Every structure is written in structure tokens, then in C-alpha cells.
Amino acid sequence: MANISSPFGQNEWLVEEMYRKFRDDPSSVDPSWHEFLVDYNPESTQEATEPAVVKPAAAPAKPAPAPAPAKPAAGPPAAGNGSPAAAPSAKPAAAPAKAPAPPPAEGDEMQVLRGAAAAVVKNMSASLDVPTATSVRAVPAKLLIDNRIVINNQLKRNRGGKISFTHLLGYALVQAVKKFPNMNRHYLDVDGKPNAVTPAHTNLGLAIDLQGKDGKRALVVAGIKRCETMRFAQFVTAYEDIVRRARDGKLTAEDFSGVTISLTNPGTIGTVHSVPRLMAGQGAIIGVGAMEYPAEFQGASEERIAELGIGKLITLTSTYDHRIIQGAESGDFLRTIHQMLLADEFWDEIFRELSIPYLPVRWRPDNPDSIVDKNARIIELIAAYRNRGHLMADIDPLRLDKTRFRSHPDLDVCTHGLTLWDLDRSFKVGGCFAGPQNMKLRDVLSILRDTYCRHVGVEYTHILEPEQQQWLQQRVEAKHVKPTVAQQKYVLSKLNAAEAFETFLQTKYVGQKRFSLEGAESVIPMMDAAIDQCAEYGLDEVVIGMPHRGRLNVLANIVGKPYSQIFSEFEGNLNPSQAHGSGDVKYHLGATGVYLQMFGDNDIQVSLTANPSHLEAVDPVLEGLVRAKQDLLEHGETDTENQRAFSVVPMMLHGDAAFAGQGVVAETLNLANLPGYRVGGTIHIIVNNQIGFTTAPEYSRSTEYCTDVAKTIGAPIFHVNGDDPEACVWVARLAVDFRQRFNKDVIIDMLCYRRRGHNEGDDPSMTNPRMYDVVDTKRGVRKSYTEALIGRGDISIKEAEDALRDYQGQLEQVFNEVRELEKHGAQPSESVESDQMIPAGLATAVDKSLLARIGDAFLAVPDGFTTHPRVQPVLEKRREMAYEGKIDWAFAELLALGSLVAEGKLVRFSGQDTRRGTFSQRHSVIIDRHTREEFTPLQLLTTNKDGSPTGGKFLVYDSPLSEYAAVGFEYGYTVGNPDAVVLWEAQFGDFVNGAQSIIDEFISSGEAKWGQLSNVVLLLPHGHEGQGPDHTSGRIERFLQLWAEGSMTIAMPSTPSNYFHLLRRHALDGIQRPLIVFTPKSMLRNKAAVSDIKDFTEIKFRSVLEEPTYEDGVGDRNLVNRILLTSGKIYYEMVARKAKDKREDVAIVRVEQLAPLPRRRLRETLDRYPNAKEFFWVQEEPANQGAWPRFGLELPELLPEKLSGVKRISRRAMSAPSSGSSKVHAVEQQEILDTAFG
């Protein structure tokens, strides 16, 4: 008798065949079998495993003709499917006599069965000793088919591979066994007694059909062990491993033993219904038939089948050992599998396990609504995906919340009254897609999910312009073209460079801060693609602004900063000849390079601006810098729709927490479409590592996305999974295309993660343990992308390894070279003060005729222009002043700017209410009373009298109600165009502190930190006039505290002419340093604060001013014994008081330039008063504010022989700039004057 109890079951033939090969030639057998086969003995194994059974009665000596089979002993009634129950007798009836086989006919071919074929005979004969019965159940397969399509479509776009029907059915079988453990038992005789053995684990046997080299087929059954402990993904992995090793001949003895229940799927070859043989040692074998429509519908068309709601069926059979399993159990077991395959919970678990980012297809009854009704619902569904599809997109590479975005009611077909039965029905979708008028719901969903729910989530329906919506819709819904192999290799090369660079720095410079890009490496191929697309359009430059994270990587792999220079900065090996000022850390520095296309012939300039650690502070600076470059190129007017005008592209990188949290982001976005500020669209890339320093998103923003603020300007938003570099590249190119088509901002939100802490010394797991449990075990994007390319056959493993080794080799070579460079010891930083000196003899006076021409311009309104009746007198007065003198402050300012325009300078003037002026003093732009047509007089100065251009421009803009972004923009403009005259005016000087970060980080220290020069002018209305603490002070003390190394010029001129010369000197001296001017308010209409024409045509800026009586020789300096030093509009109050009191013993000296303090001029002026004994500094500001906190220290050092005892006259020290009461203000002001002249 066959050895039916062999531990290898029906695989015993294979083991014996291997043993024979091993015995003849051990090397012909896989080494994993050697230990088992070295002492294997088929005979002893058979004897040892032969079960102790009661021998059957002897067969007759001669075969009897057609003997009837023995009847079973009496027992319980038939159960389950009607199969008789096993007889309770332990002694089976005698086997019937076998009839002899008829002899072969003449011509028949005889073949002795050996090896596998003989083993099959043996196994099948042995199986006859197992009394079996079979249950059969037809199961709807439509849900199985549809969900498998969904799963495999998703896998195809991710890691590759497929889920088979057998994977799903096998897993369902294992889950059903948990509910029916008896199906996992098997029968065994022990010492002549029947036993039911319940194994500790479910070991699922897979019947695998193998084809040998000779073309013959053989069947092996290999087991997946302990599969009841596996989740679906683990089960699939184990399944694929068994099948792969079977195909490769790598199965081991362990794989063949211990199978407790088997699954066979003859349906793959079209078998609809099978009753497989059950081998000893198992309780059941489950057969899977082919999926077919019911026979009566197999001739129907697809359309008719869909219309009727007919689905395919799959037949499951359970052939079981009837001695230990009853028909009812088997039937319930199949029913459970049936129910499971239709259950929401079963599919939810599988979709979660495979990280499918949306809900499975649900089993629901067909909805009998009319096609007309459903057509409308299809349109609703399409609109829902366009609006909400991003909520179901698979954009989080960490998948920290696997259920958060898997569903939205609007995206559920059931919400729209549709079911799986509608998937294959055709509906009218005319106009919805660029394609046929009618489409199956399945195809509609495929387009919608491919477009909106894969690795890119798109938000664009908030855009108000239909043309832009339509353009985006057509682009994203079009079928994506797969990158070529060459393009894929190029993307991989950028990932190699990004990761290897970080790994290299981490290895070589352990513990040094660098704010690595690890976890977000896809931003490198993304930026590369965007710049490449800009080059494809033939644009002039891409200017990048970004925070410190990833900055070194961008410098190296995007801008092209030499590795040697970066490594030298890590070494601290700075070249003294390149030192400038105090410097800054390496991850704040900028650079410039040239980008050369890999797959094209164009190149483009690329630059990265310097930035501080103040997140997002660089945003408006970048925009201003780009606008300046665009204006310099003069490709067209930037305030029009001229495409060529925007040939310089700003690319701005952000962090997710900063983009949502920093108010300057909203301020900067608000500039996007404003005249005077628009740059034709910015490419925003958010490196969304889903965490602030340690703060999780739920604590850092109230919105769903960090990008929601960008909806305010109608910018399209693309959320993209950073683990899919191809998607990142596609989005980057699309973003540039949109920018070029519509000259608008585009937002790319690349979700990724931060491999390390905020910096390399930080441990993020202390505050974000769950996230970093995932991060610590996550494979990097380079590895996962490499595996995907190898898996798809696009590249070989060797090609991938060679490319990485080549890049690592380059880094190692440069590193060794840097280590050999001459090392320079650290030295104290040098001041930059001496780098720029005002040229001697600089003339700022102008010819009288130019003043007259500017005055005439204000009355040269166009024909038919209606000037407002309150403005007309102002214009007429200006012409009068230009010819007769007594020029006031506002006109002196316009004379300065107009003269610069006439001399070929670009003048840009902006601020809140700047065109008219906060105090209705400027009227630089005249508005027609009826038509709102605008007339700008100073623009007439852009041409000479003969009509030829001067080369100058006058650009004046009302800014948005913003300080931070507005000041940053103007600073950036001066960096981009150093020759421009750029002025920003605060509404009141008090409000400039809204831009304090720009002042601290850029204006006052940009030169010392980065060598970045600026000549921006800040005009800050300042003065105590009883208007309260928020309309009084431009905070002189703060600017003086920031001043050092000649970093700025700070002035508070007291005459219109001195202001005129100050502005002209600043524009013409060739020095690139900011100018801070504290301008007047009430003094704008002070009849004493005027200047004569000769003050504009004969002199220049004077940093120290005496009273005119002394300058004219009327006053006697020898009578003076008290000198009152002062600055600003209080001078006029002091002069009036002096005249009233007839105090010839008191002289008033004005310090017009507060910093740098004019030491020589001040010394010369004071020396003219030989009898002066008392020196006072008089200011309106409180004692702890204004110029005194600095001057109280600096004046005694300047002139110790005269000013060592200088005293202060001012308001008391105050926490606010002034009193809120105008009456208290008047008392305090009088007290200052009384003390000064007391």
C-alpha cells in the first residue's frame, strides 16, 4: 500500500526524486536540501510513518464477476450535502475484488509510468482510502473583479506587482478557517483508534502546476505556514515567495510538510467546477472554478448584460474528509467565504493593508433609476471629484493616518445613487472630458481617480477665471505620458546626488548643523524639472528664495556651487581674501550659476538669494529682486499682460509650518496681482515634512492644508507625494506651463518627512514618537524609486549601483582635495565701514531751468483733463514756487525725484497712500475728477525737450496696507537693480515696526552678513504733535541702535532744500547703503520751513546746520554761552521761543545726519562758538527714546573737551512714545522749551 501518511503527502514523489539525484550527484541538488537528504531513507521513512491501522479483510483469491460494494454499517443520517456520515465501526468492510483490466488492443502504445507520474498514481490510489464528500457554492464574482481592478491600478502606479484572485480567495479561506477551525483538522489512526487532529496553526497548501524542461507538467503542493497570524500584505508576500521558489526549484523539505488545508484553482485554465482529491493528513481541499456569466447569458452582449445587472459567478467547492467534517460545517464554511467576499469589512482591511487611499467598491443592490436620472448623477460625481478628489489622493508618504482621506461622502458613488452594477453601463458625459460623448462609469471613475486621487491632489475649482479652470482641467485629465527610460535615469541621478550629498556630509562632518534634505530628496529633481522647463521657454533667469532646510543640497545640486567651496565652509577653512564683514552661517548664503538642459540646447541663469533664519522673511525680498531684474531687462511693461516682460522667474521654497504660520506669506501672496508688484507668477514649492520644529500640524494651523492661504489669490494648488519623484517632476513642469500661460502664482505642496530632527543634533522621537517609528523604518525615496525602475525593467541593478558609486566617488575626491588646502586660522571679523566712502566734491545742485521745467510739468495736464478743484491750487502753487522760491517740503521732494528722472535714473516710490501722501501733501499722481484717468507729471521728465528719452523712469505706487512684505519687496528691488532710486514711505513712522524683521535681518545687516548691498530709502513721518503714541514716532532709537560699520545713513533734515540734497546725494554717490529719513508731518505746512531757489541751485547737503542768522553774519557767535543741539521739527519751536525771549546767548545747532555722526562737521561748527560753556541735547522724544540713548554716549567721546558734560532736555523716560492727551502733550512740549531757555 502507498505511504499515505508521509509528511510530504502528494509531494513525496518529488522528495524521492531529489534523493535519487542527490545519491548520484549531490551537486545537482540545491544545497538547502543537503542536510535533509544526507540521512534520508525512503524505505525507513515509509516504515516509520506507516500508521497502525486495523487490516482489512482478505480479498478473494479469484476475482468475482462484478462484485457489489460492501454496504456501510448503520450510522447517523446523511448530513450537509447529503453525503453519508462515516461509519462508527473502527473496522472497515472488506475491499471489493478488483476486475482485471482488459488487455491492450493491437497497436496500442505502452508506457511504464515513473517518477512524478508514478507518484501521482500512488497518491491518487491512496486518496481512495479517504472517504470524502463535496460541498458546492456559486459566489458572485463582480465585487471581487472590480475591487481587484482598483487595487491593481493603484499598485501599478506605485510599487508594481499584482494581486491575483487566488490571493484574495486564499486570504478569505484563511479568515473563514478562524471561524470554522474544524475545517483545518485531519483524521489519523493511532494504535487502531480513530483520532481527529487539530493542528496548532493553519498551514495553507497551494497546488502549483510546474512545467519541466521536457514540457511535462507536474503538480506540487507547498504550504504557507502559520497563515492565520498574517495580515493580508504578509499573506501575499508569503504566497509569492512560495510560488517563486517553486518555479525556481528552490523549495525546501519544510515547504512540503505540515499542510493542513489546501487550495487549488483549476479555474485559471477554464474549469468551472472541480472535485479535487483529498490527500491524507488534511481535512479539506478547496477548489476554485473559472469566473463565468451564467450559462443562459453567455451569448448576450456586454451592453445587455450591464443593462440587466448580470455579474460573473465563481464556483467554490469544499472537498472534505467526511469522517471528521460534516456537510453542514462545509456548507457553512463556504457560505462564510461567500459573505466575506461581499463584506465591507473584508475589503476595508485589504485596502488598508495595501495602503489604497480610498474606499473599496461596495456590494449594493442595483438601483432601478432611469438612465436619464443617472446621467445627471454622473455629472454630479464628476464635479465632486474635481472639487474634492484631492481629499482621497495618496499624497502622504508616511500614511500616518490611513483612514483620514480614504473617503468623502461626495466621492462615494453610493452617495450619488450609483452602485457597482452601473460600472459597466454607458452614460452621457459630453463636454466633461476630451473624448467620446458616452463612457462607462468604470472608465469615468478611472479618469477621475487617475487624475485626482493618485499621487497628485489638485485644487483649482476655487479659481474664479473659467479659462484658467478649463486649462487646468484639460491638462490634468489628459492621459499622462510616461517618462522615457533616459528621463527616468536622469531623475534617479538627481536623487542619487541629493541623497549621497547628505549622506556624505553626515559621515564626514558628524554633529555639524546642516539642516539636511533627507526625507525630501524629491525636491531636487522637482526643482531641476521646473528650471529645465523655464529654460525650454527661453526665459532669462530663475531666482530662488528658500529657508535653511536643504539649502546646501540646492546650492550643490541645483545652483552648482562647487563642492570644494561647501566643504571648505564645513572645515572652517575660509580664504581671508574672500572675507567680508561678520559673515553668516553656511546654510544662509547665496550663490549664482548657470543651468544647462540635459535634453535640450538651452541654458538659463540660476541664483539663490541669501536669507536669514527668520522663516519666510525672504519671500517679499525675492519678489522685489525679481521685479527689478524684469524692469532692467525691459522686455515689456511689467504692469501689462506682456508675456516676455516676465522672463525672470521667482521660485520660492517654504516649510509647511511656516507657510501656514507666518503672516508675511499672506502679505507677499497679496502682492502677486498688484500693479507695481506683480512678477508674472511665482513657483512656490512647499517642502511639507508634516511637522514644525517639534509641533504637529494639528497644533500649528486651523486649516486642512498648509496651502489654504494661497486660495486667496486664486492660485492652483498641487499636493504631491514626495515618494513619487516622477509625479513631482510632472507637477513641476505643469506649474511652469501654467505660470507662463497665465502669469500667476502656482503652489506645489510636496508632502514628505524629515529624516532627522530639526537639526542634526535633535532627537524628534521625544515629541513625535509615532511619526519617527514610521520614519526610522522607512526606505528612502532613492531606494524605493530604484527598486521600482528595476522592477519594471527600466534599468539594471548594476546601472543603479554604478551611478551612485560614481557620484560618491566625485564627492570623495573633492573632499580629499579640500582637506589638503592651506588652512587659515580664524581671525576677528573686519568692519565693512571703510568699503564705501562718499566721493569728495559730489555736486547735488541743479540748474534753475530744471526746477522750472518740473514746475511746469504739474500744469501740463492732457487736453480735456479735469483736475479736482481742491488739487488745482496745489499745482499752480508748485509752478509758482519753481520760479519764485519759498519751496515747501513736498515740492522739494518732487524736485529731487524729478531731477533724477531727468538725469536718467529709474525712480520707484511706493507706500501706503504715497501717490497723494498721507497728509495730502504730495499729489504725485493727479486723478481726473470725472473719468478717473491718471496723470503723473514727473513722467514728463522721462523725455528731453527734443523728445529723446532721458533713460529715466518715474514709477509711483500705492502699496497694500502692509509693512513687512512692502518693505521687503523694496529692499529686494534695490538688490536686483542697484542703480534704481527706491523709496518706501510709511503712513506714519510708527508703523514701520511691522517690518522690523526686514530692517533687522536685511536692511541693517545684509552687507555685513552676506555682502549684499542695498540703497533702499525709508521715509518715516515722525514728530510729537499730540496725536497719541501710535502717530508720533518712527523710533529713531531703534535705527541708531542697529547702526554700526556705516551700515545705513540715518537723517532727520529740517529744511526742504537739505532733504532735496540728501535724496540726490544718496542717488548719485555710488554708495549702496540704505537711507533712513525721519520726515515731518506738521512741518509740511510750516511757513517757516521753506527754502529759496538758491538753496537748490548753489549748495549741497549739510549734515550740521546753524541758525541762518549766524550763517548770514547777522548774529554774533561770541555772545553765545549755551548751545542747544537738536534735530527735526522742534527746531522751529525753539527758534520762535528764542526770538520771543531775545536770547542772543543761546545758539541752536541742528544735527541733520544722525548716523554716521558727522564728527568733523560738528566739531567745526561748535568751534565757531568760543565762549560756549553749556551744551544740551534737546529732543521731543522721551529720555529713553530718540537720539539721546546713543548720543549721550557718543557725543562725549566725540568732543570730550566740549561735550563731556552734555546734558539732555527731553520728556521723561516713557514706555510709550507719547501721551495720549493732546493737552498733556502741550504741557510737556512747553516744559522742554522752558528748560532749554531757562
Curated annotation (Swiss-Prot):
Domain of life of the organism encoding this protein: Bacteria
Keyword Nucleus: no
Keywords: Acyltransferase, Allosteric enzyme, Coiled coil, Decarboxylase, Lyase, Magnesium, Metal-binding, Multifunctional enzyme, Oxidoreductase, Thiamine pyrophosphate, Transferase, Tricarboxylic acid cycle
Residues at which 2-oxoglutarate binds: H588, S613, H1031
Chain spans, region Succinyltransferase E2: 95-343
SMART domains assigned: Transket_pyr
Signal peptide: none
Region (Disordered) residue spans: 40-108
Ranges of Low complexity composition bias in the record: 51-61, 71-98
Region feature (Linker): 42-94
Active site: H322 (proton acceptor)
Cystine crosslinks: none
Annotated SUPFAM superfamilies: CoA-dependent acyltransferases, Thiamin diphosphate-binding fold (THDP-binding)
The keyword Magnesium is annotated on this UniProt entry: yes
Single GO biological process annotation from the record: tricarboxylic acid cycle
GO CC aspect terms: cytosol; oxoglutarate dehydrogenase complex
UniProt xrefs under InterPro entries: 2-oxoacid_DH_actylTfrase (IPR001078), 2-oxogl_dehyd_N (IPR032106), 2oxoglutarate_DH_E1 (IPR011603), CAT-like_dom_sf (IPR023213), DH_E1 (IPR001017), KGD_C_sf (IPR042179), ODO-1/KGD_C (IPR031717), THDP-binding (IPR029061)
Region feature (2-oxoglutarate dehydrogenase E1, C-terminal part): 344-1238
Pathway stated in the Swiss-Prot or TrEMBL entry: Carbohydrate metabolism; tricarboxylic acid cycle; succinate from 2-oxoglutarate (transferase route): step 1/2; Carbohydrate metabolism; tricarboxylic acid cycle; succinyl-CoA from 2-oxoglutarate (dehydrogenase route): step 1/1
NCBIfam families: 2oxo_dh_E1 (TIGR00239), PRK09404.1 (NF006914), PRK12270.1 (NF008907)
Comment on protein domains: Is a fusion protein with two major domains exhibiting structural features of an E1 and E2 protein, and a short sequence stretch of E1 localized at the N-terminus, which is connected by a linker region to the rest of the protein.
The name this protein goes by in its record: Multifunctional 2-oxoglutarate metabolism enzyme
Organism: Mycobacterium ulcerans (strain Agy99)
